Amino acid sequence: MKFGKSLSSQIVEMQPEWRDNFLSYKDLKKRLNLISGGAAGERASKRRRVGGATAVTVTAAAAGGMTLEQAGFVGLLDAELDKFNFFFLEKEEEYVIKQKELRERKMASAEEVMRVRKEIVDLHGEMVLLENYSALNYTGLVKILKKYDKRTGSMIRLPFVQKVLQQPFFTTDLLYKLVKECEEMLDQLMPTNEHSVASEDGKDDSEGEEKGSKPSSSSSANGGAVPGEAEAEDERSTDMKSTVTAALRALREIRSGSSTVSVFSLPPLHGSNGQDEPGR
């Protein structure tokens, strides 16, 4: 599957507030198609600078040795970086606060501990999604920059990627640490055999559904919640598991698309129990 289609299918699986914060891959491809290839195309594009362009845009493009179309493309790339960083840092801060709260609550009553355990599983899933968000956007940037260099004969991919490596959205050390701390909390709250089942993304859910059909199990697993609330929580957890599974599958497909390792390759995925979990 081509990257654009893979990214689109991934975005559809995400929660609404995530969707507009992924790489605008289609918009970048449209901008790229406006750029004429080769020296003749560059001369023609330069002649079009005079049209509706502002003096500031013309000056910036000329100073960088770019056509207006090229400057517009790079400007959109920079705007995308700002978008990634804002969303990533906002989510990371949210997860730090939530994890601190859960760490304090896990010492509460037995019923509350069961609810906390469920919330930790959901938080773990969201953080894995954010790791995938980082990796997918990085992959998209590398791919669109490769197309840009090929079309224009420029060599901006390497310097731009070097800049990307310093961006907050790509620096996931703290996030990876939070994921591991979540797993440690689950180890403390969950029996070993139960933990292994809960952590296996993509595994058959029939066993879990069978357990959920027992009234006593449903009640305790949700901290004594009323049936309607319990069903809603179970549905949210199922949706989260499906989304995480789809995210990991999409990322595996992207990584397996090429066996060639280069300076632009994503680092190896960190994982537990043989499962792929991206982190850097």
Curated annotation (Swiss-Prot):
Region Disordered, residue ranges: 191-244, 257-280
Top-level lineage group: Eukaryota
GO biological process: cellular response to cold; cellular response to phosphate starvation; negative regulation of unidimensional cell growth; regulation of leaf development
Outcome of gene disruption: Slightly increased angles of leaf inclination due to longer lamina joint with greater lengths of both adaxial and abaxial sclerenchyma cells. The double mutant spx1 spx2 has abnormally inclinated leaves. Altered leaf inclination phenotypes of the rli1-1 single mutant are suppressed in the triple mutant spx1 spx2 rli1-1.
Tissue expr: Predominantly expressed in roots, leaves and seeds. Localized in leaves lamina joints.
Pfam families in the record: SPX
Compartment(s) of residence: Nucleus
Cellular compartments per GO CC: nucleus
Induction comment from the UniProt entry of this chain: Up-regulated under phosphate (Pi) starvation in lamina joint cells. Up-regulated during cold stress. Up-regulated by the transcription factor PHR2.
UniProt key word Nucleus: yes
Assembly description: Interacts (via SPX domain) with PHR2 (via C-terminus). Interacts with RLI1 in the nucleus to prevents its positive regulation of leaf inclination during phosphate (Pi) starvation.
Name assigned to this protein: SPX domain-containing protein 2
Gene designation per UniProt: SPX2
